[in-house]
């Protein structure tokens, strides 16, 4: 790596869909590599595939990057000196470079119709060959070209691949790579409507924006030799470095597909479910990387410090949603109570009923139990609004009907009634006093108190549940179950 050259990486999505976990990982790794090397991270939008662009596609990319706290040094929202940062605003630049290649006879006009090209493609497949352009238009004379232009026959511009050579690069993830030009075709660089193709526009952008390193998914491996060939023809991007990240697979071993609607894999999904951005960044960091000390919980700052592109795996990496949930739960546990309340509160959609006014205590009750904030709604319902019947709970735990259990609950009620201050510490003292007075412990102590006071056989920390329910409701609940026992 040239120590005197400023490291500049880029994330260059197309606004053809929502922000996918694969694209987000690419953005993160580019950000980490740049920041580890005191460089710049640039975001630009490659929107020249106009027919596939979706509404709000650009916003989904930029706003969700911001939510993840991956802040670019330059982007359409905070432009620097090397814009524009949206390709459709750069069309004259591409046209100029394409005309340069045409003038230097490194590109040529192609008048072939889509129907002709499709016919040739099918014939190649039928003959067992890889479809390639047959260079019909490369041999056109100047007079033939002039006649076609005069007759307004549409044409695209194709780049002429040099024959009988090899294109090589040292991939910082995969090592030495080599592709013979016999495996390539002459690619279209400018469509008949004047719109550049991906492989042409991207090299112009990378040069103009002084990009030093291109880190992207392995699906771009087939694009790299074309981009290197165009770079060489234009005499640009001489020292640019490529790195191709491993594919992300699902638990069945198949490549992650955006069409698999059963698997949530868009950043918007995680955001709406109530995952924290810190947890998602942490999870993405581990998609292809691991730490030498097996540490799995990282902050973004720690990820920058520890990032080493040479340790990125070349093998497929598995998207494990349960692992993401575990990482998220660990990040919630590390949050301060006030930060957790602020984060989780907007996700509470259940009618809190008698719990209103105790929202903060209710939210904190489940801090150590959730992977994403929306889960709190079900836990609130389960804990406070879905009581079990006395008959049902006694069927599971018959000892709850015994006389000594009834006496334990009466002691518990009496202790609560005499309690001067209603707080969690005092409630814990009451439970301890019941333990000493009755000689009960473990399940024989805590299960009756939980069931009689909350009408639920399981839930979060008992003293906290009792505190939130309130003295009057707890005593009322306990007495109603005693009545069901014929007391």
Curated annotation (Swiss-Prot):
Motif position, 'KMSKS' region: 255-259
SUPFAM superfamilies per the UniProt record, alphabetical: An anticodon-binding domain of class I aminoacyl-tRNA synthetases, Nucleotidylyl transferase
Annotated positions binding ATP: 258
A single GO cellular-component term on record: cytosol
UniProt-annotated location(s): Cytoplasm
PANTHER family associated with the record: GLUTAMATE--TRNA LIGASE, GLUTAMATE--TRNA LIGASE, MITOCHONDRIAL-RELATED
Entry's family note: Belongs to the class-I aminoacyl-tRNA synthetase family. Glutamate--tRNA ligase type 1 subfamily.
Protein name in UniProt: Glutamate--tRNA ligase
